[in-house]
């Protein structure tokens, strides 16, 4: 037998460090393979084998977390992203990174029997890596109000909460129709500039849920066009002469207040002359959950206050 050299010790030490990880991954594979499963087609067009009764669900986006809790199935959640802050109960759950920078090792360590992802946000390569460990990933892709409602129904079906999901869907659709009826008789479509960020100035174009919310609420989206999230200079916005400016900050609330004060310097703007600059909760507009209808109603009340007194 040859004597051990330093490289042997290094290799042995490396293997010792890897053993717990390998064992953990093997256990995870065993967990996700037990129980009955069925095939489901997700909103990315993929056929996914999902468990009949998932008990260890990991949410890969704040909107998914909200939907699961809205369905009354929060106990199934074993991991969420660091941005999952609603409802408050979600904040105490184990974190698996941000929805853009997912921590694969943490996800696997939670031994989920189902992960639910969003197509617009979760990196596809990480989703593929999760699936490589035998963990099913069901992807949703809500891009308008209809598909937001469909997403709630599909998640409800995944979690055996279809009755609650149908109730939420019916309520959402009824509230959408009430808004449409109220704004239909106004005969006006005020020019709306919806500002998502302060540096740079970003708005929401035609192919976004926010555009649909503005139009459904009876407004004209000044950022409509081919780009989903176009950038604007201050001069470009001034030239558009918005009648309503709505600001939602992706960062600090102070940014929104500062931006509002900056707009008010331009007294020639119709929105400034008529005191129609508003700051809104970003989560009501960029998360396709039941709360997005709160955003629609808020928007309609801002654009057509005479119809929502």
Where are these predicted regions, by residue range?
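His/Asp/Glu-enriched short active-site or ligand-binding loop at hydrolase and phosphoryl-transfer sites
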Residues: 81, 206-229, 249, 278
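Alpha-to-beta junction loops
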Residues: 110-115, 136, 240-245
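A ligand-binding cleft/hinge motif common to bilobed small-molecule-binding domains
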Residues: 121-132, 244-262
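Short secondary-structure boundary segments
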Residues: 61, 119-120, 196, 226-229, ...
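A short, structured surface patch at a secondary-structure boundary
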Residues: 55-110, 114-121, 222-225
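Extracytoplasmic substrate-binding proteins
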Residues: 38-40, 46-47, 113-114, 124-202, ...
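Bacterial N-terminal signal peptides that target proteins for export
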Residues: 4-21
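Bacterial N-terminal signal peptides
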Residues: 20-30
